[in-house]
């Protein structure tokens, strides 16, 4: 008899989890790499969790970008500079923000990212041109953009407490079958790093299926 058990694809795992009434959760971290990235990767390793990192170009932390890939997480794009004025100034400036980062990450890791997250999300109010202008370029490059439907709230100017971040994430996840959770991996987001173990432990206690974004992941988009 064939004793080899076929590995389920992510989409099969998701269908099975949802049929069983379990939650499906994608943990995503924007704005890295940073001084916190290595600690965050260690926490994820500790729990056997794979996440998704939407990164910007930060040459001083090149090593961590490589680590994201070698440790089996999904490396994705968040723009080269994260400077709203430049990212959204024109079609050409947006194209440059995507191309420079894509080429940079490919050279660094050998992996060409397929996923992008708009700074501020696709519903941001910082763009003078319609967001569809920029989406059209991503479509041409076969790059998929991902927003989020659960926010940790850690992206504002005020640093939230570990409890606030934890509560924001868990209450958001509890209200949805499939959650794409927005968090930030920047060095002044220390409490996000500290909240991550508690968030993972609670999700595991809930028997949630925690996955990285892959090319098969159905994108969550804000209503444009």
Language-model features, listed with the residues they occupy:
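Catalytic domains of cell-wall/extracellular-matrix polysaccharide-remodeling enzymes
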Residues: 39, 84-182, 186-204, 208-209, ...
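Active-site beta->alpha N-cap acidic-glycine motif
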Residues: 2-113, 202, 209, 218
């Amino acid at each position: 008899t064939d004793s080899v058990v076929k590995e389920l694809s992510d989409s099969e795992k998701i269908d099975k989890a949802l049929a069983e009434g379990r939650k499906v959760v994608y943990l995503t971290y924007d704005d890295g790499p940073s001084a916190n990235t290595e600690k965050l990767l260690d926490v994820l390793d500790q729990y056997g969790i794979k996440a998704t990192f939407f990164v910007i170009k930060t040459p001083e932390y090149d090593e961590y970008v490589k680590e994201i890939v070698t440790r089996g997480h999904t490396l994705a794009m968040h723009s080269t500079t994260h400077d709203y004025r430049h990212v959204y100034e024109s079609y050409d400036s947006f194209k440059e923000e995507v191309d420079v980062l894509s080429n940079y990450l490919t050279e660094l890791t050998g992996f060409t990212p397929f996923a992008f997250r708009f700074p501020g999300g696709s519903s941001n109010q910082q763009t003078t041109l319609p967001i569809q202008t920029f989406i059209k370029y991503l479509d041409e490059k076969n790059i998929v953009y991902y927003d989020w439907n659960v926010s940790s709230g850690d992206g504002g100017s005020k640093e939230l407490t570990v409890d606030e971040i934890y509560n924001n994430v868990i209450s958001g996840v509890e209200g949805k079958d499939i959650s794409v959770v927005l968090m930030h991996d920047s060095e002044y987001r220390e409490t996000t790093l500290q909240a991550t173990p508690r968030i993972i432990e609670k999700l595991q206690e809930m028997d949630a299926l925690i996955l990285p974004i892959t090319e098969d992941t159905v994108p969550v988009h804000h209503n444009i």
